[in-house]
From Swiss-Prot:
Taxonomy of the source species: Bacteria, Pseudomonadati, Pseudomonadota, Alphaproteobacteria, Rickettsiales
One GO process term, biological-process aspect: 'de novo' AMP biosynthetic process
Superkingdom of the source species: Bacteria
Family: Belongs to the adenylosuccinate synthetase family.
Function (record text): Plays an important role in the de novo pathway of purine nucleotide biosynthesis. Catalyzes the first committed step in the biosynthesis of AMP from IMP.
Magnesium recorded as keyword: yes
Cofactor: Mg(2+)
GO cellular component: a single term: cytoplasm
Organism: Ehrlichia ruminantium (strain Gardel)
Sample GO molecular function, one term: adenylosuccinate synthase activity
Residue sites binding GTP per the record: 12-18, 40-42, 305, 331-333, 413-415
Pathway in which this enzyme or protein is active: Purine metabolism; AMP biosynthesis via de novo pathway; AMP from IMP: step 1/2
Name of this protein: Adenylosuccinate synthetase
SMART domains listed in its UniProt record: Adenylsucc_synt (SM00788)
Length: 430
């Protein structure tokens, strides 16, 4: 099996975790390459639900290497909590099956506090998860962030780095009349957590290089979705990292000479958590039905997801940005009850027709979707195990999506369970 990059083609929550978990069975390693514990992957195995935030989905498999790449911002306390919770549930996690990049920036409590403060300052709130992700990435770009490798330092060297970080954060706190953080206190906290983290730490770029030299199969697991990308998303209602497929090379530390199949995961309808434009949103009984049937609650935020019709304009743009080879279509069963289904094929604003998402947030907020209507199937697809099991109109819907997007559907997820997957085209598995 070739290397595979798995990315979401909407606003996240497409079902990437389940897909990566399923693919992991035939892979040697899985790499998380961006984001932090603001991402959430839900995986169901034999009716038991696992919720992952930082750990790659492969951690639930035996004899698979899970890698947290340099593109991830790492909350060490959240990571240890996640590890401890999985161990309680019988999952074996050790230095042989988990590796953490020495270059990961550290997410600390000061970042979470800063996240909350910055959200208060905004005229229009973004709907951040308040996990400290944005402020940590800001520190990284400003070259003052603490990184995992700093936990190896002697106390006096670490103190100087902490003090440099606090020169900024204490100034911010002062403006909000919040007491400053003492450098010595933060140093002690870091030295306390360090022994739990450091055994997992290695130069991840070298680990991945060695795997490629041995012709091992690697999956690169994206978090969030294309239109939460800091550069290509619906700015400013985006995350703080790049979420599209090319980031796998940067955030994992693998060079471009290694060929990969790029799988785009996409729901049969569209959802979004938090604020920001949503062109096909249904604030009516249709959206309510999608929400209820899809159990659309955010894994991390625990907020209700907004729901709407499938947006082919959004999907086409995402496919181009990541160079998607094939699609994984998820949650088809949520549409089972509709007698007719709509697909957005264009937008309209001020007399102009758009076949892409304009960058202007003002224009985005005023786009009107143009729909094509197709017949529904009013039959149950949940748990279907073969393509032939699907209703005729459900197959027609899938083919319509392929026709519009000009990319084949490789897999269809028919339920939350690990093996609830229909394989249409398996060439990427060879």
């Amino acid at each position: 099996m070739t290397n595979i990059v798995v990315v979401g083609l909407q606003w996240g929550d497409e079902g990437k975790g389940k897909v990566v978990d399923w693919l992991s069975n035939n892979a040697d390693a899985v790499v998380r390459f961006q984001g932090g514990n603001n991402a959430g992957h839900t995986i169901v195995i034999q009716e038991k639900t696992y919720k992952l935030n930082l750990l790659p989905s492969s951690i639930l498999h035996n004899n698979k290497l899970s890698i947290i790449g340099n593109g991830v911002v790492l909350d060490p306390y959240a990571l240890m909590s996640e590890i401890d919770n999985l161990r309680i549930n019988g999952i074996n996690i050790n230095t042989q099956n988990l590796v953490i990049s020495e270059s990961c920036p550290l997410v600390l409590n000061i970042h979470k506090e800063a996240d909350t403060l910055f959200e208060q300052l905004r005229q229009n709130t973004i709907g951040t998860t308040n996990k400290g992700i944005g402020p940590c990435y800001a520190d990284k770009i400003s070259r003052r962030a603490l990184r995992v490798c700093d936990l190896f330092d002697k106390k006096d060297i670490l103190y100087n780095k902490v003090n440099n970080l606090l020169n900024y954060h204490n100034l911010l706190r002062q403006n909000f009349n919040i007491l400053p953080i003492e450098a010595s206190k933060l140093v002690d906290e870091l030295l306390d957590i360090a022994p739990k983290i450091l055994p997992f730490v290695k130069p991840v770029w070298k680990v991945i290089h060695d795997l490629t030299q041995q012709n091992k199969t690697i999956i690169f697991e994206g978090a969030q979705g294309t239109f939460l990308d800091i550069d290509h998303g619906t700015y400013p209602f985006v995350t703080s990292s790049n979420t599209i497929a090319p980031q796998a090379f940067v955030g994992g530390g693998i060079n471009l000479s290694h060929s990969s199949c790029i799988l785009g995961v996409i729901k049969a309808y569209t959802t979004r958590v938090g604020n920001g434009p949503f062109f096909t949103e249904q604030k009516n009984e249709i959206g309510k039905s999608m929400f209820e049937r899809g159990n659309e609650i955010g894994t991390v935020s625990n907020r209700e997801r907004r729901c709407g019709w499938f947006d082919a304009v959004l999907a086409k743009q995402a496919i181009i940005l990541s160079g998607v080879s094939g699609l994984v279509l998820t949650k088809l069963d949520v549409l089972d009850q509709f007698s007719e289904i709509k697909i957005c094929t264009q937008y309209k604003y001020d007399g102009v027709i758009y076949d892409y998402i304009p960058a202007s947030s003002y224009v985005q907020n005023n786009l009107e979707p143009i729909y094509e209507t197709v017949p529904g199937w009013k039959e149950n697809t949940f748990g279907s195990v073969t393509y032939e099991d699907l209703p005729k109109n459900a197959i027609s819907y899938i083919k319509k999506i392929e026709e519009i997007l000009k990319v084949p559907v490789y897999l269809i997820s028919t339920g939350p369970e690990r093996n609830a997957m229909i394989i249409i085209n398996d060439k990427f598995l060879k």
